[in-house]
Amino acid sequence: MDPGGGGGGGGPGPGPDMEEPADLEVSVKTLDSQTRTFTVGAEMTVKEFKEHIAAAVSIPPDKQRLIYQGRVLQDDKKLQEYNVGGKVIHLVERAPPQTQGPSSGGASRAGSPSAPHAGAPPAGPRGPGAPVHDRNANSYVMVGTFNLPSDGSAVDVHINMEQAPIQSEPRVRLVMAQHMLRDIQALLARLEPQPGQQGQQGQQQGQALLAESGPPRPGPPGQTDGETSPREPTETREPTETREPEDGVAARGTGPAPGPAPAPAPEGNAAPNHPSPAEYAEVLQELQRVESRLQPFLQRYRAILGAAATTDYNNNTEGREEDQRVINLVGESLRLLGNTFVALSDLRCNLSATAPRHLHVVRPMSHYTAPMVLQQAAIPIQINVGTTVTMTGSGARPGPTDTTPTSGQTSSPTPSPTSGEPGPDGAPSGPAPPQAAGPPRLIRISHQSVEPVVMMHMNIPDSGSQTGGTSSASTASTGLPGQGLGQQVSGFPAAPTRVVIARPTPPQARPPHPGGPPPAPGATIPVPGSNASLAQMVSGLVGQLLMQPVLVAQGASGLGAPQAPATASASAGTTNTATTAGPAPGGPAQPPPPPPPGPPQAEVQFSQLLGSLLGPGVPGGPGTAGGATSVGSPTITVAMPGVPAFLQGMTDFLQATQTAPPPPPPPPPPPAPEQAPAAAPPGSPPAGPGGAGGGPEALPPEFFTSVVQGVLSSLLGSLGARAGSGESIAGFIQRLSGSSNIFEPGADGALGFFGALLSVICQNLSMVDVVMLLHGHSQPLQRLQPQLRGFFHQHYLGGREPTGPAIRRATHTLITGLEEYVRDSFASVQVQPGVDITRTNLDFLQEQFNGIAAHVLHCTDSSFGVRLLELCNQGLFECLALNLHCLGGQQSALTNVINGRIRRLSGGVNPSLVSWLTTMMGLRLQVVLEHMPVGPDQVLRYVRRLGEPPQPPPEEPMDVQGAERAPPEPERENASPAPGTTAEEAMSRGPPPAPEGPPPLEEQDGAAAAESEPWAAAVPPEWVPIIRQDLQTQRKVKPQPPLSDAYLSGMPAKRRKLRSDLQQRLRADPNYSPQHFPNAQRAFMDEP
C-alpha cells in the first residue's frame, strides 16, 4: 500500500501547462512543521524555486527535496507543470550518510534499510527510517506506524526515543494546529474548482501520507471525534513526511525499506524545543488564511442548510450530490477548525518573563484527554518516552492478501474476536477458536526497561475481514468458554480501546525480544510474589487511565462481545506501563488468561479487576471466566473510549455502557485539596452495591494500596506529592497551600463543628484512602469509626447520651446555623417560582444528617463503613436531584452555585489549582447530572414552598453550640462526582454510586462563605457589614406570585372561565395531588 506511485500517480506530471495565473502562490512545509508561503512566477523551474527559498528555509538548494503528492519534484521541470499553485509542498533535506545512525536503542535503525518496518509486501521503497537532521525529525510525535505482513514474516522495529526531554506541549499544540489546518486546506482543495485528476489523487493520498489532497476521507473522521480525530490524518502524515513515502523518495539516500517508518527521532536537538511567540503568530496567520478561504463555502453551506428542509431534489440528483458534498466537507472543516481553536486557545506568553520568551500552556492536554494518544485506525501506538521499545509484527497464517494501509491509520480494523494463533515467528499467543474472518495479526511490544517485562499484544484483523465484529466475536466467545472477552459497549460508535496488561511468568520475564522464538513455555502458573513490581506496573497504567474516561470491561463467559479496535496508547508520562488492544499476552502456548470477573453481578469492584492479576489460577476466582481454571498469565483488561470527552462528550458512551451488567468502578478523586475533604468522611465515592465478590479474597489490601499509591504518584507528581508515603490529606493540602492551619477549627457555630470534623477526617485519611473510598472500598471509613464516634459524641451531642430526640435536637441546631450560607449560595441563581430553596435544603440536610449521625453514634459492627458510604452516596445524589429540580433543571445554575462555593472555600489555595478543580468539577458534574440515578419525583417530598409553615423544631433545641450542617449540598455533590475520570463509570453503573458524603463539603462551604466573599476584598473593610446587610434585605423581598392581579385582570373572560373549569375538574379528580402535579397546582389552583 505504501508504494508511492499509487496515490499521487497522476499528480505531477503530465499535464501540459495548465492554465495558471502569471504568479503562483506556493506553500512550503518543512518537517519542523513550519509552513512558508512564496509567490513566484509560474514559469519558474523547480531548481530556481529551490534557490529562491533556500535562504528562508536555511537548506542549500542542492540538499532540498520537494515532495508534492508523493513525488519528488524534478529540478528541470517548471512549477506550473505540477499544478502546485495554492497547494502545499513538503520540503525535506536529503538524508545524511548512513553512518550517522542513532546512538541508542535502534539496532536496525540506522544501519541497513532504515527501520525495517513490518512491511506489507515490499510495497514500494521508503526513505530512511530516521533522518538524523533535526529538521526531518518530529520530536513531538512519538509514534511508530507500520504495515503488518500478511505472509507471516516478522520484522523488528527499534525506535530510539531519547528525544523525550525535547517534547514540549506548546510545540505539540502548534503542530496539532498546523496539521489540522493542513487537513482543512486539503478539504478546501477538494471544494475548490480544480482539474478532475485532483479528486482521484485526493482519494488515493490517504495511503500516500505526504499527499496533500486525501486526508480526511470519511474514514478517518468517522473513526474518531474530538481532538485526537484531527490528529488522525496528521499523525499519519507526520511520520510520513519524514519518511517521504512514495517511490520517488527512495532516492533519498538510504536503502529502501518496506512500509512506512515510525516518526524519526531527532538526534541533533539537545535542549527543550519550546516554540516562540512568533511561531504562534505564523500559525494564527495561516489560520486566518484558511478561514478566509473557507468563508465562501461557509456562506454556501448556510444557504444549503437554510433551504434544506424544503428543497426538492427529485429531478436534480447531481445538484443534491454536490450540495451533500459541500455539507460534508464544510462540516468536517468546521470540526477541524474548532479543534484548531481548542489546541491554540491554551497557549500563552508571559510577557513578564525575561527574553527570549517562549510559549507555555495554561491547561494541559490531559485536561481534555490522554495526552498524545493517537486514536485513528490501524496501529497508532504512543510509546513511553525514555525507553527502548522493541516491536514485532507477526502475521498469523497467510490470511487475506490485503494488509493494513501504509499509514497505519487510514483503515479502521474491526476488533478481533480472539487472540492470535501461533504466528510463524513462533510466538503463539494462545489458542484461537475457529474464525471466519481469518487469523488476526499480532503485534507484541515489550518494554525492556521495566521489571517485570510487560507484553503488549494487539490483534489486528485483515483489512478485508472487517466484518461487523459482533458476529465474529460471538463465535469466538462461544468457541472459547474459558476465555473472557472484554464486554463490548453496545451502541457505542467505535468500540473502545481494549487494554490488556500481562505479567509474564518467570521463565519469560526477559524474552530476548518478542520477535524471536519465545523461551520454553515453562511453568504457566504465575508466581504470586513480586507484588511490588507488578503494582508499580499496573499503577502506571491506571494512573494514565484515570486521567480520561474509562470503562473497565468485564469478561462475561458466554457473552459474545466484539473486541475493541487495535489502538494502543501508553501515557507519555508513565514510564512503566504498556497498554494493548487484544487478547491477553502470555508465553508461548499459553491460553490467553481471562480478563476480569465474568459473573454479571453488580458488585464487581475495581479491586476485583486488580485481583484478577493475582488470582487467575484459582478456580472460580475473579481471574477465571465461568469458573474455569485458568493457567495463563494474570491480566487486567480495561476498555477506554476512543473519543476525547472535551468535544465529543460522554453521553453516548455512558448511555451505551449502562447496558453492561457489571457496574464499572467509581471515579477517582482529583488531587485537589478541596476535593479531598469532600471525599472524606461520609464523603466517599460511589461504591458497588455489594462489597464482597471474588476480588477482595484474591487481592491483598496491601497490593491495592500499593497500586493506588502508584496511581497517585502519577496523578499528583506535578504537585510534589511523595509517592508511597502515607501523607494525610491535611498534610498534603497544607504543604500545597503553604498554610499551617487551613481548616480554621477554632471558629464558632456550625463553622467550628464542620471545621473540626474536617480536620479529624483529613488528619486521619490519606489520599490513598480517598481513592479507595472513591472506588467503593469502605475500609478507610471503617478504620475511622472510633474517631468519628468520639468526635460526634463530644462535639455533636456535647457528651449526652445518643438518644433519638437528642440527635434530632442536635441536628436541628446544627443545620439551622447553615441558613445564611445556604441562602447566600443560591442568591445569584434563578430558583423556580414559589420554591423556598433555603428551607428545602435545610430540611433535606437535617433529615440526611439525622441518619448519618444516628449511624455514626449507634453502629458498632463491621457494617459501619459500608453503610456510612451508602448514606453519603444516597444523600449526595438526592441533593443533586433536589437542587436541580429547584433550579428548574438548569445544570449551569447548579454548576455556578458549586463553583462559587469552591472559589470562596479556596481563598488561600493556588489559583491555578482552584481553576483546575472547578473545571474538572464542572465536567464531571455535567456527566453525572445527565445520568442521575435519582429522578425529580423521588425528591419532591423535600421541596418546600414559600408560605408553608416551617417544621416545628424538636423539643427545646440543644444549647450545645452544634455546628452547622453542610451548606448547599451542591458543592459536595460536585465534589464527589467531579473526582476523577471514572465518574462516567460510576454513573453508568446505575446503582448508588456517589462520591463523598454530604457533610464534609457543606461545612467547608459554610466556613469559607462567610469569610471570603469575592467582593469583600474589593471594598473597604468598614463597608463589608453594610453591604452584607443590604444583600440580606434584598433577599427578603417577596417574589411576585406566578399569576399576578395585573395578569388576571387583563385575562380574557373566556380564558378566565377555562381556568375556573380546570380548577373544578382538578378538585373533583381523585387522582389529582398537588405533590404529584406541582405545575398544575401552581398554574391553576394557587390563588394569586
Curated annotation (Swiss-Prot):
Region listing for Required for interaction with GET4, in residue ranges: 1015-1045
PROSITE patterns per record: UBIQUITIN_1, UBIQUITIN_2
Keywords: Acetylation, Apoptosis, Chaperone, Chromatin regulator, Cytoplasm, Differentiation, Immunity, Nucleus, Phosphoprotein, Repeat, Secreted, Spermatogenesis, Transport
Segments of this protein annotated with the region Sufficient for the delivery of client proteins to the endoplasmic reticulum: 1027-1088
Gly residues bias spans: 1-12
GO cellular component labels: BAT3 complex; cytosol; extracellular region; nucleus
GO MF terms, alphabetically ordered: misfolded protein binding; polyubiquitin modification-dependent protein binding; proteasome binding; ribosome binding
UniProt region (4 X 29 AA approximate repeats), positions on chain: 243-640
Ranges for domain Ubiquitin-like: 24-99
List of residues that carry N-acetylmethionine: 1
Pfam families (alphabetical): BAG6, ubiquitin
Predominant place of localization: cytoplasm
Transmembrane segments annotated in the record for this chain: none
Composition bias type Pro residues, residue spans: 504-521, 585-600, 660-688, 990-1001
Domain of life (superkingdom): Eukaryota
Protein's cellular compartments: Cytoplasm, Cytosol; Nucleus; Secreted, Extracellular exosome
Compositional bias annotation for Low complexity: 101-121, 193-207, 398-429, 463-479, 560-583, 1007-1025
Marked site (Cleavage) residue numbers: 1005-1006
Modified residues (Phosphoserine): 103, 976, 1073
Domain notes: The ubiquitin-like domain mediates interaction with the E3 ubiquitin-protein ligase RNF126 which is responsible for the BAG6-dependent ubiquitination of client proteins. SGTA also binds this domain and competes with RNF126 to antagonize client protein ubiquitination and degradation. The ubiquitin-like domain also mediates the interaction with USP13.
Function comment: ATP-independent molecular chaperone preventing the aggregation of misfolded and hydrophobic patches-containing proteins. Functions as part of a cytosolic protein quality control complex, the BAG6/BAT3 complex, which maintains these client proteins in a soluble state and participates in their proper delivery to the endoplasmic reticulum or alternatively can promote their sorting to the proteasome where they undergo degradation. The BAG6/BAT3 complex is involved in the post-translational delivery of tail-anchored/type II transmembrane proteins to the endoplasmic reticulum membrane. Involved in DNA damage-induced apoptosis: following DNA damage, accumulates in the nucleus and forms a complex with p300/EP300, enhancing p300/EP300-mediated p53/TP53 acetylation leading to increase p53/TP53 transcriptional activity. When nuclear, may also act as a component of some chromatin regulator complex that regulates histone 3 'Lys-4' dimethylation (H3K4me2).
Subunit structure as annotated in this protein's UniProt entry: Component of the BAG6/BAT3 complex, also named BAT3 complex, at least composed of BAG6, UBL4A and GET4/TRC35. Interacts with GET4; the interaction is direct and localizes BAG6 in the cytosol. Interacts with UBL4A; the interaction is direct and required for UBL4A protein stability. Interacts with AIFM1. Interacts with HSPA2. Interacts with CTCFL. Interacts with p300/EP300. Interacts (via ubiquitin-like domain) with RNF126; required for BAG6-dependent ubiquitination of proteins mislocalized to the cytosol.
Protein name stated in the entry: Large proline-rich protein BAG6
Annotated gene: BAG6
